[in-house]
Structures are given as C-alpha cells and as structure tokens.
C-alpha cells in the first residue's frame, strides 16, 4: 500500500509516537488458514525480525543501518519494542514465539517483546496463552476485544485483580460493536462510545498493568471499508471523527493523576 517500515518509522517520528511493528511469526491468519512454517524452516522469519531491529537502530556501519542511512535517515529510529504474531494462538504459536524471543533477546536484550493472546479475551485458548506467555516472561500480552457495549460496561473492573508483577498488558485492539444489523454509519454511536469510556476508566485505574491501548481500526473510507465501526471516517473531501473518536480525544487530552473511589450501598463502583 506504499507504506513500508521506513515510512512507518518516519510517521511515528513525525507525530511523536513510538513505533510498534508487528511481525509474522511463520503462521497464517488462523481464521482463514491452518498454514504454518515448519520449525526447521523458521530461521528466515526470525532473521527478518533481527534485520528490522538493525535497520531501525543499527549504526551506519552495519548492513541494515547503512541501508537506512542511504535512504536519508542516518540517525537511528530508537525502536524499543516489537510484536511477534497477530491474533495467533495454540501450542504452535508458543513454540514459534519461543524461537523468536530467544533470538531477539540474545542479540537485542533491550527490545521489549509483545505477544498475542489470540482473538478472544476469555475462554480456553486465552487462558492457555495467558498462562504460557507469562511463564515465558514476555514483556506485554496483547489482548483484543471486539464485544457488545454491555461487555465493556461489565468488564471495567477486569484488571483490578490482575497480578501487578510480571508481564504487562497491551490492549492492542478493541471497540464496542453495537447491533450488527445496523448500517455501518450507525454502528459508531454513543452507546458504543460511552461503554468504551466506562471501560477505559478501568484501564486508567490499572495503568500499572495495562500500559498501552489502541482502538481499532483507525481509518475507513465511507465508500471503501472492510470493517466497521471505525474510529475516523473519511471521504474525498472530509474527515469525520466518530463518537468513539471523541472518547479517545477526551482521554488523550485529559490524563488522570488520581483514582477517586465511588461507592454505592457500601460497595465500590467501577465503570
């Protein structure tokens, strides 16, 4: 689509953000295919990850640092984290993740590893991965949730009981999905946005556990979308922020510094 790692790193630099590339771990999207790369053929994929770190951070006398400099950016991009796999799951994923993690930590111990917890925030697959990834001491467990507004309202206290030690949480993809029978332009509504806002109170209250979060997807064209709802809609003349965008803006521009307890009938309220 005309956006490679170089352009992505430049974009992050321009807007003052930290880049977080997510790399293929040798497994196809498990929604669509069971294809995977055999373990004895995984080395090229691992080398791609190592080369990417060198491209982002390496001195100009390294192979990939020299290529970056030749492209016009001699200074390093200061990459600090990398994701291995997206919504992958099962023992096959853990096996491949272990190989990536060993190689990356051996050569670049300062790079943080973000690992997938699959497609769902509950169930046997999630429980298996959550336990396995924490045993591996990955830096972040990437949790995704596309759920109805009621789920977000009832899960504002989800992270209250999470352990404060070990792997942190990256809420890497989330959005409240209202009635699927609604047209695309009506799925970004205040019901969804308010439930996300309530859920975010729990993330902010547990910021020592959930250290990163990102709504998804970010952009969609009103006449050429594949997924809805989306945070920002565009046409050839306008950019329209959804109700969910207003929630993201509210939290981005008004960072909380204190958690104030609210109780009803002697019980602490959340969400």
Each predicted region: which residue ranges?
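N-terminal catalytic cores of secreted or lumenal carbohydrate-active enzymes
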Residues: 1-111, 115-129, 135-136, 152-153
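Residue-level detector of alpha-helical recognition elements and their boundaries
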Residues: 67, 156, 228, 262-263
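Intrinsically disordered, low-complexity segments enriched in polar/charged residues with Gly/Pro
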Residues: 69, 75, 101, 188-189, ...
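Histidine- and/or cysteine-centered catalytic micro-motif in compact active-site loops
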Residues: 118, 146, 263
């Amino acid at each position: 689509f005309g956006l490679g790692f170089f352009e992505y790193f430049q974009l992050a630099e321009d807007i003052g953000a930290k880049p977080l590339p997510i790399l293929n771990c040798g497994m196809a999207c498990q929604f669509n295919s069971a294809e995977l790369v055999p373990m004895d053929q995984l080395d090229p994929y691992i080398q791609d990850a190592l080369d990417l770190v060198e491209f982002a951070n390496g001195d100009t006398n390294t192979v990939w640092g020299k290529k970056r400099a030749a492209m016009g950016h001699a200074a390093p991009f200061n990459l600090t984290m990398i994701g291995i796999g997206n919504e992958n799951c099962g023992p096959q994923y853990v096996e491949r993740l272990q190989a990536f993690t060993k190689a990356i930590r051996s050569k670049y111990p300062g790079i943080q590893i973000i690992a997938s917890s699959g497609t769902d925030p509950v169930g046997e697959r999630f429980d298996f991965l959550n336990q396995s990834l924490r045993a591996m001491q990955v830096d972040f467990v990437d949790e995704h949730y596309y759920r109805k507004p009621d789920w977000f309202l009832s899960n504002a206290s989800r992270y209250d009981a999470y352990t404060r030690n070990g792997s942190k949480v990256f809420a890497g993809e989330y959005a409240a999905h209202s009635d699927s029978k609604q047209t695309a332009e009506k799925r970004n509504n205040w019901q969804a946005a308010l439930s996300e806002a309530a859920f975010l109170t729990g993330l902010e209250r547990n910021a020592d556990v959930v250290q990163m979060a990102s709504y998804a997807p970010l952009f969609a064209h009103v006449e050429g979308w594949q997924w809805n709802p989306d945070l920002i809609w565009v046409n050839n003349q306008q950019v329209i922020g959804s109700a969910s965008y207003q929630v993201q803006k509210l939290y981005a521009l008004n960072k909380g510094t204190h958690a104030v307890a609210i109780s009803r009938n002697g019980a602490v309220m959340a969400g």
